[in-house]
C-alpha cells in the first residue's frame, strides 16, 4: 500500500469512476431521446441522477416525470461513444455548442441500438443493454448556486435483465461475476476486472435490504 504524502490539486472534473447510464426519455413530439451520463448512484430502489438542467434529458424528465435507466455492458462502449457530443436539443445550448456538441434527432439510430417497448413507462428500453430500470421522478433537487445542475431522485418501477447476468439458481439476484458494466472514469471508458478480495459485507443476505419501494413497484400496472 502506497502511504506517500498527499498533494492538493484542483481537477476540472471529479469523475472517479461510475457506471455509464443510457437514459431514455420522451421528447415533446413523442419521439425517444437517448443520452449517456455517469453521475448516478442507487439507494435501495431509488437512484439519484445529476444532469444539466438545460439538457434535453433533464427537460424531458421534468415534463413527463418518467424514463428508463439502461445500463450498458463494457462491450457496448463503441455504441455509447457514438452518442458522444450529441444532443437532442435544437438549437444546441450555448454551453454545449462551445464544447463541440451537435444536434441529433435519432439517438437510437446514431448509436445503432434497438428501442423496445417498456412495461410501465412511455420511453423505450434499449434491447442490447443487459440491465434496464423503468423509473418515475419522485423529487428534483437543485445543485449549486447557479441553477445549472439538478439532481433527480427517481424511483424504480421495474428491473429487467438479460438471463446472462442473472445468478444461477436464484430468481432475483445479479451475478457480479457475469455482470460487466461499462465504467466512465475521467471521460474515458473502462471495464471491471475480477473480484480483488473476498467481501465481508457480502455475507449479509440481499433479501435483508429489500425495502417498501419493491412492494410499491409490484402494484404498478403495465401500460
Language-model-derived ranges and their functions:
Residues 1-223:
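Basic, polyanion-binding surface patches
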